[in-house]
Curated annotation (Swiss-Prot):
Protein name: mRNA-decapping enzyme subunit 2
Region (Disordered), start-end ranges: 287-341, 417-465, 499-692, 831-862
Main enzyme class: hydrolase
Binding annotation for Mn(2+): 149, 153
Record flagged with keyword Metal-binding: yes
Biased composition (Acidic residues): 526-539, 625-637
Domain of life where this protein originates: Eukaryota
Entry's Gene Ontology BP terms: deadenylation-dependent decapping of nuclear-transcribed mRNA; mRNA processing; nuclear-transcribed mRNA catabolic process, nonsense-mediated decay
GO molecular function terms attached to this record: 5'-(N(7)-methylguanosine 5'-triphospho)-[mRNA] hydrolase activity; manganese ion binding; RNA binding
């Protein structure tokens, strides 16, 4: 039988018995580390005291109330072994109290939802009100300590409310207090402490009232007075944020109400995509009906009306895109698809204008144009495109693709090409919107009209600037009426200088005229995109650089303003003349005249030539394109104006050349003076006389305005160009053909790049390169030049007749028949006879030597030598550099060259020509044909600028073929 157990301490009245029980429970059996210090042992004494107060005294109310000090003294007195320290108990308790004050305290300042009230607690042993708080335990963080203490004292869990960044921290009497700020706690919560004899009261206090009556009322507060200011600031900030959020939400709601935006009107993106697909399917079904001829007559009439409205509308309109879809196809385009019911017609409204107007395609000949504002940048990787895309069978399992037909590539209309698929939805086109300044109707009017109205030209800024680079000689057929206004001498100079614009591309790029049409179209597509991406400022800079290059190419009779400005920076003329031939050969004959520019200027010239090559290659598409002829004529006009500007800069200030050369020195240079020849002086004397003959103004031509250019600026430039040049073309032609090539350049100075010069470049060097020879003790020989306008006119007529024959389809040449019909053809055929044999150069010393024997035995010399031809041949002979130049004939250059063109047209035996090594003295025979001598002289000039071992046959052509190719060049 078991005995009923009772509580050990129930009805116990002996204090010693109770103390013995507590001593065993809390002190004797504790770990040794907890007894290692006085403070740690007193913590166990404190826990035993709390147990006595919380439990034993409640069971035995008659027991005395014991504080920590009296309780510790009774324990030590009952068991002295537990106290092994040499310190008294009261002193140990004071030390223990100081230690407890150093322990950090963590608590919470709890506010209600309106931020108007704060929650405070009052302890059982204190009459002051403060935050719920507690001491941090060992290895416990701040957040966990705050949550634990608040839950013990008020029974509320702050896990979902606490923010580790919102707190107030203070140090009071060496004790750290960290109070976290909590808001949004409900006032209706039933707060109840979970510990005994620690919290007496829990109440909500009005924060505003506390802040006013803190120091006046009888209620005591702890920690609140020291934290009142930061609490007030935090509350103000929280109220402001709350008010701003409410204000923003209120304003948003009111704005939506004003705009009529409600949540019900918002469309789901998935639903919107589905609606778009349904619309596309419905459009495709309508297209099938149109292809089958089921469109009602009223709808067809509406389509035709819209089509005519788009063609006739000329002014710019800007309107937002309409949600309605344009008609998928016009009735005129449904015919190719009428027989095939499985074909979906194209749905691109942007191609309607081009498909319905085939003449526009024929006129433009596939030239690129700026896209319309409503067109998406669709890419087409096929080499050619068809104005009507290839039919694609429908796929009803997949969503329709209304954008499958991209922008047609109009470079080639030979065959169809499969369009690349494009998955974007179609861009809607406004029903009432017309095309802007790049309208096809306006473009067609420009192409068909030879002289459009100046007002129309000034109001548009076409983007077809890619075709304004280079010069096409075929465009002269469209401009014969305008060229008659030029003087005969000026037109002769222009005809002789035209090959220079196209022969530069021979060494760097292949001629695109021999390429297939597809290849040309691909090149134009890539270069058109590069050109459109470049700025107008770069294009204008390139044009200025080309102008400076043309100035250097001009005949060096008088120094230009550009050379005068750079007179302090150039090299001595003697040194420049020695090294200039190498510089010109290394740059692939880019700089024809004597090089005076700095290396930076030469690099700019090379870059400008590269840009010219890029755009010049794009114009060789077809000879019969009206659009290309129109653009080429404008470009030819620009080239002529630039040449006139060049001559104006060279003769704007008729200052004596000797005066300008006297101060043309650099630091460390010995002053010297170059003595000009009598030929240059005679030419300078004829400037005033010849300037009065070329005063006829040219008829203005059509000029496509560039981006950023206005008609007023174009008119000013035109006036400047019209009044630019009055220099005689006969003088320039004579100076061009007269300049000898120096033989002082040693063979080791020749650039290896000269071997890569094409035949065109060699002949152009012969005709246009300025003299770089160094006069040595030259004697002044007086001679004068007279003007013969009648001979120049006759020569101009023959050259124009020659050019017309060249532009015709090329046929096998018959020398006898052509020589009887056209004197210019006679000279060409005579030069062509010399094509059978080429002679390599040999090096015989420091200076370049010419071949010692050149024989031709293909015909007999049966005509006498013309006197005037002999005189012109003497001009063209290389002059001995040690004895000065030979005397020049008094005959006019145009008359002399005309006599050569009228000279013997039969083949003759070409005798040996012996050249002296030091001065290229030519031993001529009176029985030689003057035309053959002219050819030999030109070949000798060509050999003077090439490498010593350069063989003319290395390129497969001789000097005569090279000259013939220049005269035939387009």
């Amino acid at each position: 039988m078991s005995l009923p157990l009772r509580h050990a301490l129930e009805n116990v009245t002996s204090v010693d018995r109770i103390l013995e029980d507590l001593l065993v429970r809390f002190i004797i059996n504790c770990p040794n580390e907890d007894l290692s210090s006085v403070e740690r042992e007193l913590f166990h004494f404190e826990e035993a005291s709390w147990f006595y107060t919380d439990f034993i005294k409640l069971m035995n109310p008659t027991l005395p109330s014991l504080k920590i000090k009296s309780f510790a003294q009774l324990i030590i007195k009952l068991c002295p072994l537990v106290w092994k320290w040499d310190i008294r108990v009261d002193e140990a308790l004071q030390q223990f109290s100081k230690y407890k004050k150093s322990i950090p305290v963590r608590g919470a300042a709890i506010f209600n939802e309106n931020l108007s009230k704060i929650l405070l607690v009052q302890g059982t042993e204190s009459d002051s009100w403060s935050f719920p708080r507690g001491k941090i335990s060992k290895d416990e963080n701040d957040i966990d300590c705050c949550i634990r203490e608040v839950k013990e004292e008020i029974g509320f869990d702050l896990t979902d409310y606490i923010d580790d960044n919102q707190f107030i921290e203070r140090n009071i009497q060496g004790k750290n207090y960290k109070i976290f700020l909590i808001s949004g706690v409900s006032e209706v919560f039933n707060f109840k402490p979970q510990v005994r004899n620690e919290i007496d009261k829990i109440e909500w206090f009005d924060f505003k009232k506390i802040s006013k009556t803190m120091y006046k009322s009888n209620i005591k507060y702890y920690l609140i007075n020291s934290m009142m200011r930061p609490l007030s600031m935090w509350l103000r900030h929280q109220r402001q944020i709350k008010n701003e959020d409410q204000l923003k939400s209120y304003a948003e709601e009111q704005l939506k109400l004003l705009l009529g935006i409600t949540k019900e009107e918002q469309i789901d993106p998935g639903r919107e995509l589905l609606n778009m697909l349904h619309t596309a399917v419905q459009a495709n079904s309508n297209n099938n009906a149109v292809s089958n001829g089921q469109v009602p007559s009223s709808q067809e009439h509406q389509h035709l009306k819209e089509q005519s409205g788009e063609h006739n509308q000329q002014k710019d309109q800007q309107s937002s895109f309409s949600s309605q879809q344009q008609p998928s196809i016009f009735p005129s385009l449904s015919e190719p698809f009428a027989n095939n019911k499985n074909v979906i017609p194209p749905t691109m409204p942007m191609a309607n204008v081009f498909m319905s107007n085939p003449q526009l395609f024929a006129t433009m000949n596939g030239q690129p144009f700026a896209p319309f504002p409503f067109m998406l940048p669709l890419t087409n990787n096929s080499n050619s495109a068809n104005p009507i895309p290839t039919p694609v069978p429908p796929n009803f399992n997949a969503p329709p693709n209304p954008m499958a037909f991209g922008v047609p590539n109009m470079h080639n209309l030979s065959g169809p090409a499969v369009s690349q698929p494009f998955s974007l939805p179609p861009a809607p086109l406004p029903r009432d919107s017309g095309y802007s300044s790049s309208s096809p109707g306006q473009l067609l009017d420009i192409l068909n009209s030879k002289k459009p109205d100046s007002n129309v030209q000034s109001s548009k800024k076409p983007k077809l600037k890619i075709l304004q680079r280079g010069t096409d000689l075929n465009s002269i057929k469209q401009n014969n009426n305008d060229e008659t206004a030029h003087s005969n001498s000026q037109a002769l100079l222009d005809l002789l200088k035209k090959p220079t614009s196209s022969q530069k591309t021979h060494a760097s790029k292949p001629d695109t005229s021999f390429l297939p049409n597809d290849s040309v179209s691909g090149i134009q597509d890539a270069e058109y995109e590069d050109f459109e991406s470049s700025s107008d400022e770069e294009v204008e800079t390139a044009r200025d650089e080309r102008t400076s290059l043309n100035v250097d190419i001009g005949v060096n009779v008088m120094p230009s303003e550009k050379d005068s400005r750079r007179s302090q920076k150039e090299k001595p003329r003697s040194d420049a003349n020695k090294t200039n031939l190498n510089a010109s050969a290394e740059s692939n004959s880019v700089e024809w005249g004597p090089g005076k520019s700095s290396p930076s200027t030469q690099s700019k010239q090379n870059s400008s030539v590269g840009m010219q090559n890029k755009y010049r290659q794009e114009i060789h598409i077809g000879d019969s394109d009206a659009y290309e002829v129109f653009e080429s004529s404008s470009d030819e006009e620009d080239g002529k104006k630039l040449e006139e500007l060049e001559q104006t800069q060279g003769n704007s200030k008729l200052i004596s050349q000797d005066i300008l050369k006297e101060n043309n020195f650099q630091d460390g240079e010995v002053p010297h003076r170059d003595m000009p020849t009598e030929s240059n002086k005679s030419i300078n004397e004829t400037v005033g006389l010849s300037s009065t003959t070329n005063t006829v103004k040219k008829v203005p031509k059509v000029k496509i305005l560039k981006r950023g250019e206005t008609f007023a600026s174009l008119a000013n430039d035109k006036k400047a160009f019209d009044s630019s040049s009055n220099v005689s073309s006969s003088k320039d032609l004579l100076q061009m053909l007269r300049n000898p090539i120096s033989s002082t350049v040693s063979s080791n100075q020749q650039s290896p790049k000269s071997q890569h010069l094409s035949g065109d470049e060699e002949i152009m060097m012969m005709l246009k390169r300025n003299s770089v020879s160094k006069p040595q003790n030259s004697e002044e020989n007086a001679s004068t030049s007279s003007i013969n306008d009648a001979n120049a006119s006759e020569l101009l007529g023959m050259l124009k007749q020659k050019e017309k024959d060249i532009t015709a389809p090329k046929q096998p040449y018959n020398v006898d028949s052509y020589s009887q019909k056209n004197p210019a053809k006679g000279l060409l055929n005579i030069l062509k006879k010399n094509n059978s044999t080429g002679y390599p150069r040999t090096e015989g010393g420091p200076s370049s030597e010419m071949p010692t024997s050149m024989k031709r035995n293909d015909a007999t010399n049966n005509q006498e030598l013309d006197k005037n031809s002999t005189e012109l041949l003497n001009y063209l002979k290389p002059k001995p550099l040690n004895d000065g130049y030979e005397n020049i004939s008094n005959k006019d250059s145009s008359h002399e060259l005309l006599n050569i063109l009228h000279g013997n047209k039969n083949s003759s035996t070409f005798n040996n020509n012996v050249y002296a090594t030091d001065g290229y003295s030519l031993a001529s025979d009176n029985n030689e044909n003057s035309s053959n001598k002219l050819l030999n002289m030109l070949q000798n000039r060509s050999s003077a600028i090439n490498e010593p071992n350069f063989d003319v046959r290395s390129n497969g052509t001789s000097g005569s073929n090279e000259l013939l190719s220049i005269l035939h060049r387009k």
